[in-house]
């Protein structure tokens, strides 16, 4: 859902998304499947998984699958140290009555975790670190996996979102006139990334 705000797709079959319908845990295994499929078809294309820390925790053991099967995926991990979509639901639809969303000390250092699997990891904590991290990932993404851990604000919301009991046509935050356009400005990055 993070990528849905900015990405522009210009070819068919280049975007996998749960479309806000149960997104947590979808991105990383979907990226592995896309990379395995591309590899089987002889396509040398980069595959990028943009995921939150909560979704990644649901199947982070698949780092082993990625390495064992030589599937060089770029993992862009948005780390807000909580179950972000759950927190956002509780904020928007339940009067900010927060319950069981905070990782506390249970959120690992994902860079160290990636490195334990032999995957390069980079932590991005300031807006000025973004460009070099992306260049690093772009330079290796076809041959080696890499994890980019973006430290973001605890209360960063993700749009669009489907309200409780709703369906795709009821998504909130999809007004084409107000959605940000890529490339993202430095000011927009500074709003998202921690200082």
Question: Which stretches of residues belong to each language-model region?
Answer:
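Thiamine diphosphate
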Residues: 2-195
